[in-house]
């Protein structure tokens, strides 16, 4: 998913660097820019959903939740290095909440 946004950003950069943009290409460029911005917001919502799911489910089903969260992150790490930071954050939340559930 992250690789799709990188490809879209690269295509937008190539498209925006044309020497003589006419009205049609300006409209297309504006439309493409809006699509990229919207897709980036959707990607951030996806990340926030994973973090919230981790926090809400960790105490009840730690092993199931870890597998549910780890699989998307391991696949994203292959495509995007910045996902590693998100994976470490979610893993830290998982470990912290697991220890808290054991103490209770």
Swiss-Prot record:
Which keywords does this chain's UniProt record carry?
Answer: Endoplasmic reticulum, Meiosis, Membrane, Transmembrane, Transmembrane helix
User: Which biological process annotations from GO are given for this protein?
Assistant: meiotic cell cycle
Coarse class of the protein's main subcellular location: endoplasmic reticulum
The keyword Transmembrane is assigned to this record: yes
Query: What is the protein's membrane topology class?
Result: Multi-pass membrane protein
Q: Is DNA damage tagged as a keyword?
A: no
Quote the subcellular location field of this record.
Answer: Endoplasmic reticulum membrane
Record-annotated membrane-spanning stretches: 30-50, 54-74, 84-104
Supply one GO CC term from the record: endoplasmic reticulum membrane
The protein's job, in short, is:
Has a role in meiosis.
Q: Name the chain's protein.
A: Meiotically up-regulated gene 150 protein
Organism from which the protein derives: Schizosaccharomyces pombe (strain 972 / ATCC 24843)
Lineage runs: Eukaryota, Fungi, Dikarya, Ascomycota, Taphrinomycotina
Q: What gene does the UniProt entry assign to this protein?
A: mug150
């Amino acid at each position: 998913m992250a690789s799709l946004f990188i490809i879209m950003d690269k295509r937008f950069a190539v498209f925006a660097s044309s020497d003589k943009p006419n009205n049609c290409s300006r409209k297309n460029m504006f439309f493409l820019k809006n699509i990229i911005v919207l897709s980036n917001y959707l990607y951030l919502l996806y990340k926030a959903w994973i973090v919230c799911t981790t926090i809400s489910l960790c105490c009840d089903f730690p092993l199931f939740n870890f597998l549910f969260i780890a699989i998307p992150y391991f696949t994203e790490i292959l495509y995007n290095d910045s996902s590693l930071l998100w994976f470490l954050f979610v893993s830290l939340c998982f470990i912290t909440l697991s220890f808290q559930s054991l103490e209770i």
